[in-house]
Amino acid sequence: PRPEVETFLKSLPFELTGAQTKVWKEIEKDLGSEKTMSRLVQGDVGSGKTMVAVLSALLAYGNGYQTCLMAPTEVLARQHYTNIVKYLKDTGVNVSILTGTTRTAERRQVLADLADGKTGIIVGTHALIEDNVVFSRLGLAIIDEQHRFGVEQRSRLWRKCPDGVPPHILVMTATPIPRTLAMTLYGDLDVSVIDEMPPGRKPVQTIQITERKRLHLYQFIRDQIAAGRQAFIVYPMIFINDKVDYKNLESGYEEVVEAFPFPPYKVAIVH
């Protein structure tokens, strides 16, 4: 590995898990080959996907290339940005963020630094594929939850390489996908799985229930609240949309308030 990566790994206050190391070696091999990497990294929340992404970006930086990390929401983008800045604070890598709410003056500076090559890593949302976003030397594109981005959106990002050569692609997902299904959905991607949690991390349980068991779910939430915990209910839509039959926050909030009346429950809404 490049000295930047070796130095960084030695500076970490923890060791990578066996699964992280295995996946990192696969990525490192891809980046060191003559072919363009196209790899999917799958792992539960907290399994350490971001660290693998940071190592990949650091390797690209050491070779003189820029990295962009595109997330589907501003909240997730800022979370990635905060973590990456924390990890790389002593490396000299300039990390920037660009979202739809970035103020004009700040946006102008971010775009200038990106085009001049001063920015090594940029994190953002769909704002990264706008026409005025120009890279100096994009070498690695990391996409979190690729299924939330359309084909055209992704291809617009690829076209931002000045020399016309597509960047290496690293896709991250926390969605549990059986390998056979992954081959169908992401047939063009090699698949790596981080199937081990760092020491001290509790495993994440993913449970799917049907609509008819919603009352059982509400009772489970009441039990968790009684135990001193909190519950977050996430909706794919904010308002009712006649074009798609998705649950929405507007009507869902009313339903939740009815199921969890005040007092003793306190229900808040944010979007």
Q: Which residues are covered by each model-predicted region?
A:
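Upstream accessory/linker segments immediately N-terminal to the RecA-like ATPase cores of bacterial MutS
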Residues: 1-12
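Inter-lobe coupling/hinge segments of SF2-like helicase ATPases
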Residues: 10, 14-25, 32-271
